[in-house]
A protein has these predicted regions:
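Extended charged
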Residues: 1-29, 47-53, 61-124
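Short recognition patches in nucleic-acid-associated and regulatory proteins
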Residues: 29-43
């Protein structure tokens, strides 16, 4: 997938071109663009690779939002979701070369493998 501008994604790798709050799936009311990896030049990297999402203001800047004092869990969830999506088509080493670290710990990289034939059932 390539964005409209060379070397930059005009869409989010998590949401595509949809303009809806990532957490509430609503498109009404104001939405703010959140760069998933931010600070020290990371906003430009997030723009370049599509590492951003649309959020309602309370999910962005509210107390429990990604930038709020109680928002660590939702911030980490976004970072992990983004890394998982990136690793569907790229390696963990590529992600770490771009971002500088992994947010997935010991979680295996890449797409989940389909199980062997289970007689029509998908076992979780």
């Amino acid at each position: 997938m390539q964005g409209a501008r060379t070397g930059s994604h005009s869409y989010s790798i998590l949401q595509g071109k949809s303009k809806r709050c990532y957490f509430t799936d609503t498109e009404t009311g104001p939405l703010e663009r959140h760069h998933i990896y931010f600070g020290a030049g990371m906003r430009q990297i997030s723009d370049k690779h599509g590492f951003w999402v649309w959020l309602k203001p309370e999910w962005h800047r509210g107390t429990s939002g990604v930038h709020g004092r109680d928002g660590h869990k939702v911030d980490l969830r976004l970072k992990q979701d983004c890394q998982r999506r990136f690793e569907e088509t790229h390696s963990r080493e590529e992600f770490m070369a771009i971002i500088g670290r992994s947010y997935l710990g010991d979680e295996p990289e890449g797409k989940p493998q389909m199980p062997a034939d289970t007689g029509g059932f998908y076992l979780l």
